[in-house]
C-alpha cells in the first residue's frame, strides 16, 4: 500500500529510472518511461525529491491526477509551499478533497483562531485552478467547518417572520442563488464565493440550503478572527 511507503525506502534522484536532467532535456522519453509505470511506482519516484522536480515529473505523467492524490497530503503541501502557490496551480487543481482539507487545516488557523483572510486567499487561489476539487470538498465531511467559513464571509436571511431581521446589511453586496435566501457579502472580493455558491446550488441544492440554514441559526464561533 502507498501509505506504507516510508522515506527511508525512497530513491533519490540517482535512483530514478532515467537521468534526472531528462525531465528538462528529454521530456518525451520521461513521459514514455512513466507511462510504463504503475501509480504506486510513480509515487515512489516522486516521493522525497526536490519539490520543483516533483512538479515537473507530475506534469509529464499520464496519470498525474492519480499520482498526486496518492501522495501524502503533507508531501503535496510542501511542494506547493516550496514551488509557490501561484506557480503550482496545476498540482493544486489535482489535489483531492482530503488533501485540500489538510492544506486548510494548516493554513486557515493560527493556534485555535480561524483566519478568514487566509481562507479567502485559498478560495481565490483555487478559483484560478482548472477544475479544482473545491466543490467536492464542500460536499465532504466536516459540515461545521464549512458553516464557519461561510459565516466569516456572509450574512444570510430569508423573507419570513423568523429570519427576516436583515440587520447590518446596509451597503453590503446582495445576492440570491434561488430567490429564497438573501445573501449579503461581508467581504469586498465576492466573485469567487458567489461562483462557488452557484456551483454548489447546481451540484447539490440540498447541501447549499443546509449550509445557508446553518449560517442563519448556528451561533458564530468564538474562534472567528475579529
Language-model segment annotations:
Residues 1-94, 98-226:
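General marker for long, soluble alpha-helical cores
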Amino acid at each position: 500500500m502507498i501509505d506504507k511507503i516510508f522515506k527511508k525506502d525512497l530513491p533519490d534522484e540517482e535512483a530514478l529510472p532515467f537521468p534526472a536532467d531528462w525531465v528538462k532535456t528529454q521530456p518525451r522519453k520521461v513521459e514514455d518511461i512513466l507511462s510504463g509505470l504503475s501509480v504506486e511506482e510513480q509515487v515512489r519516484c516522486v516521493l522525497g525529491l526536490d519539490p520543483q522536480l516533483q512538479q515537473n515529473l507530475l506534469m509529464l505523467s499520464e496519470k498525474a491526477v492519480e499520482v498526486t492524490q496518492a501522495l501524502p497530503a503533507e508531501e503535496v503541501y510542501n511542494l506547493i509551499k516550496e514551488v509557490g502557490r501561484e506557480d503550482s496551480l496545476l498540482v493544486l487543481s489535482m489535489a483531492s478533497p482530503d488533501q485540500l482539507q489538510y492544506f486548510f487545516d494548516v493554513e486557515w488557523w493560527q493556534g485555535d483562531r480561524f483566519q478568514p483572510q487566509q481562507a479567502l486567499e485559498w478560495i481565490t487561489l483555487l478559483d484560478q485552478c482548472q477544475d479544482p476539487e473545491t466543490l467536492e470538498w464542500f460536499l465532504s465531511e466536516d459540515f461545521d467547518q464549512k458553516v464557519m467559513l461561510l459565516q466569516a464571509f456572509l450574512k444570510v436571511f430569508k423573507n419570513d417572520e423568523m429570519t427576516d431581521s436583515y440587520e447590518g446589511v446596509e451597503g453590503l453586496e446582495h445576492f440570491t442563488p434561488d430567490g429564497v435566501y438573501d445573501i449579503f457579502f461581508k467581504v469586498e472580493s465576492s466573485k469567487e464565493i458567489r461562483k462557488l455558491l452557484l456551483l454548489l446550488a447546481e451540484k447539490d441544492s440540498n447541501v447549499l440550503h443546509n449550509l445557508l440554514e446553518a449560517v442563519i441559526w448556528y451561533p458564530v464561533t468564538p474562534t472567528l478572527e475579529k
